[in-house]
A protein has these predicted regions:
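Conserved Rossmann-fold NAD(P)-dependent oxidoreductase catalytic core, especially the SDR/UDP-sugar
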Residues: 7-44, 62
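Short glycine/proline-enriched coil/turn segments at helix->beta-strand junctions
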Residues: 11-17, 57-61, 124-128, 149-153
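Structural signature of the Rossmann-like NAD(P)-dependent dehydrogenase/reductase core
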Residues: 16-19, 62-68, 99, 108-109, ...
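Active-site Tyr-X1-5-Lys
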Residues: 28-31, 40-67, 90-94
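Hydrophobic alpha-helix immediately C-terminal to the catalytic Tyr-X-X-X-Lys motif of short-chain
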Residues: 51, 55, 84, 88, ...
Length: 224
């Protein structure tokens, strides 16, 4: 679906297209990566986004390679608690601990509302191509440290055990700022506070419900 539906769109729709790809296309690489850096997708999801980008390369499309999302969009949408910041805050509150696998992996973080802001900012601009979109690069262990500052009762447990997600990369979003004048502004602390308020105030009855995890939600309906 991620690629073939985009192929149909590119072939049959000639107006403005805004496509949300992912920085996961970079996989695991050293250094600060920009849009000219080589790609190294490590999952079927990332590979499907690479293929979709290829289908759109000659269309009237702006393609955002999104960083790792965090935070809450509004009080009505389905909340995702399977994102690294959101799940660590939730675990800190409900279990009193954060389990960090390794912790030295880098992630380019991006608040979900900055995705909407970027789309609105560029929707009417006659700009096409691929653009990284993130706020700031963080190591996983530094994310955990920031959460413990908010929730001092929580403990960080680190383990050398290899995690199934081997992504590790930092990106630059300078191209987006130079060409479109947009820069993500919502910081990590804001997102931590949002998830903290959501969980601490028990606005979610069961934080372990499958609806709050994309993978679990799809598997419940037989989609893998």
């Amino acid at each position: 679906i991620n690629s073939e539906s985009v192929k149909f769109l590119a072939q049959n729709f000639k107006k403005r297209i805004v496509f949300l790809s992912t920085c996961s296309v970079y996989g695991a690489q050293d250094g600060l990566l920009d849009e000219k850096s080589s790609i190294n997708p490590l999952s079927e999801y990332a590979s499907s986004k690479v293929q979709a980008e290829e289908y759109l390369k000659d269309s009237n499309a702006i393609i955002f390679r999104l960083g790792t999302l965090f935070g809450i969009s509004d009080a009505f949408s389905r909340i995702r608690l399977d994102l690294v910041v959101n799940i660590l805050v939730t675990k800190a509150l409900t279990e009193g601990k954060l389990t960090v696998f390794g912790g030295e992996q880098w992630r380019p973080l991006l608040h979900v509302n900055d995705v909407a802001n970027a789309i609105m900012n560029t929707l009417d601009q006659n700009i096409t191509g691929v653009f990284n979109l993130h706020h700031k690069n963080f190591k996983i262990i530094d994310i955990a440290d920031a959460i413990v500052k908010k929730i001092p009762s929580a403990k960080i447990e680190t383990t050398p055990m290899k995690f199934q997600d081997s992504r590790n990369y930092q990106v630059s979003s300078e191209k987006l700022f130079k060409e479109c004048g947009f820069k993500a502004e919502i910081d990590l602390t804001t997102g931590i506070n949002e998830v903290y308020d959501l969980v601490a105030n028990k606005r979610i009855k069961n934080v372990n419900h499958k609806r709050y995890s994309n993978q679990n939600f799809l598997e419940e309906y037989g989609i893998k």
